């Protein structure tokens, strides 16, 4: 199989993750896909292939030189986002895209248009893999998996390219924030690694959000509305008051770059009890801590007004900015930067407005910045990936291996 054939095969597996199951992997389809990948890696003759009960698949491409070299790794995740169906994905290749609207689903009038997604125009003349408008595509992150496997095959077929020992790792449940939780860094055995999980060509990322989740529960008192004066306490109104106390412009839709936010992701409730759920994000660790303190302060303020115990807070950290773990080993960024330039890709170093498995792995002792996989519009029906983007990502992997061996 070539790179494109491999990718088209991979997206046929339904691997949506599900945070509600509390299992690892969170869905059985991920293990089905992992078993398929394991058999493919075996057929390629890779070594030290292991697939554990949690769905973590590791393998080794042995060194083809006697030179003492660091062991490096490439990592991608097998799950797709729970935000949109990944079942019965039906991809289509739009050859030599001409810049016009792409009809994904005529009967439902679902159109991928440059008027809504202007980044399409950056890929005129290229070959785009798109959806049928009814599912996501799964380039996040099956493009990354296809690129890693295809790069390994390329290195096998070109023994003149010298490289050290390379480890590859495919993990479940990145999309629900648990991809690194049971990743055995010691078993993986690398000095450093790269996740192939970025978007547009050139993306090179080693800064991400510090992240926390907050759940605030508001207690009320329900009384027949006809006789409720001075008796009823409506928890929905208290929840609404809390929501309005947070800065209205410090939200995802009003921020970019290094700006942090509070993101209201869920509301449930009735008069008796209501719950609001937030995610809290900031690149700056001090500002991140201040945001958490502000949530705590507002909860205390609600309790001061309505009585102690009216509002209860569950607050937990999710992950931290990997920059502090990458800065001491900036040569791994320099290597990726040089590899991109060597294959004609202009590096675009920027902060991740999110998190990656690599962020958590970095704090577990495996420095792990993120490199582009080439897809765009992740997590929805408008997701697409230019074939040329995937080819460039594959070339970057090969070049990194070559550069590490040349030093």
UniProtKB/Swiss-Prot annotation:
This chain is encoded by the gene named pepT
Q: Tell me, what does this protein do in biology? A: Cleaves the N-terminal amino acid of tripeptides.
Indicate the residues that form the catalytic site.
79, 174
What is the name listed in the Swiss-Prot or TrEMBL entry for this protein? Answer: Peptidase T
Family, similarity comment: Belongs to the peptidase M20B family.
Q: Which PROSITE patterns match?
A: ARGE_DAPE_CPG2_1, ARGE_DAPE_CPG2_2
Q: Which organism is it from?
A: Bacteroides fragilis (strain ATCC 25285 / DSM 2151 / CCUG 4856 / JCM 11019 / LMG 10263 / NCTC 9343 / Onslow / VPI 2553 / EN-2)
Q: What does this protein's record comment on cofactor binding?
A: Binds 2 Zn(2+) ions per subunit.
EC number(s) recorded for this UniProt protein: 3.4.11.4
A GO BP entry is: proteolysis
State the NCBIfam families in the record.
peptidase-T, PRK05469.1, PRK13381.1
Pfam families from the entry? M20_dimer, Peptidase_M20
């Amino acid at each position: 199989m070539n790179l494109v054939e491999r990718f088209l095969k991979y997206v046929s597996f339904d691997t949506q993750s599900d945070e509600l199951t509390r299992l690892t992997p969170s869905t059985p389809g991920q293990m089905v896909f992992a078993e398929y990948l394991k058999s493919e890696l075996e057929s390629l003759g890779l070594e030290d292939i292991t697939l554990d009960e949690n769905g973590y698949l590791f393998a080794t491409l042995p060194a083809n030189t006697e030179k003492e070299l660091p062991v490096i790794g490439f990592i991608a995740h097998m799950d797709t986002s729970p935000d949109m169906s990944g079942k019965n994905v039906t991809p289509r290749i739009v050859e030599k895209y001409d810049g016009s609207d792409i009809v994904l689903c005529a009967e439902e009038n679902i159109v991928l248009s440059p008027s809504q997604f202007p980044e399409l125009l950056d890929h005129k003349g290229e070959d785009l893999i798109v959806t049928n408008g009814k599912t996501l595509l799964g380039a996040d992150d099956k493009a990354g998996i296809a690129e890693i496997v295809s790069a390994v095959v390329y290195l096998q077929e070109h023994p003149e390219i010298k490289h050290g020992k390379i480890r590859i790792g495919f993990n479940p449940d990145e999309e629900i924030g648990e991809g690194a939780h049971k990743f055995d860094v010691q078993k993986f055995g690398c000095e450093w690694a790269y996740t192939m999980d970025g978007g547009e060509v050139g993306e090179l990322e080693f800064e991400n959000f510090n992240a926390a989740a907050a759940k605030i529960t508001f207690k009320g008192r329900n009384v027949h509305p006809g006789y409720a004066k001075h008796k009823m306490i409506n928890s929905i109104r208290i929840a609404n008051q809390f929501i309005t106390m947070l800065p209205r412009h410090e939200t995802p839709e009003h921020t970019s770059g290094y700006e942090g936010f509070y993101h209201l992701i869920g509301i449930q409730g009735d008069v008796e009890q209501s719950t609001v759920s937030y995610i809290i994000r900031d690149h700056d660790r001090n500002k991140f801590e201040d945001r958490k303190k502000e949530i705590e302060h507002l909860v205390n303020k609600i309790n001061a007004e309505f009585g102690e115990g009216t509002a209860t807070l569950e607050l937990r950290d999710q992950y931290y900015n990997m920059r502090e773990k990458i800065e001491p080993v900036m040569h791994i960024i320099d290597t990726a930067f040089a590899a991109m330039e060597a294959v004609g890709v202009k590096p675009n170093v920027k902060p991740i407005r999110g998190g990656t498995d690599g962020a958590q792995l970095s704090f577990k002792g495996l420095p792990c910045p993120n490199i582009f996989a080439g897809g765009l519009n992740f997590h929805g029906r408008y997701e697409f990936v230019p074939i040329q983007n995937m080819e460039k990502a594959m070339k970057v992997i090969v070049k990194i291996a070559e550069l590490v061996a040349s030093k």
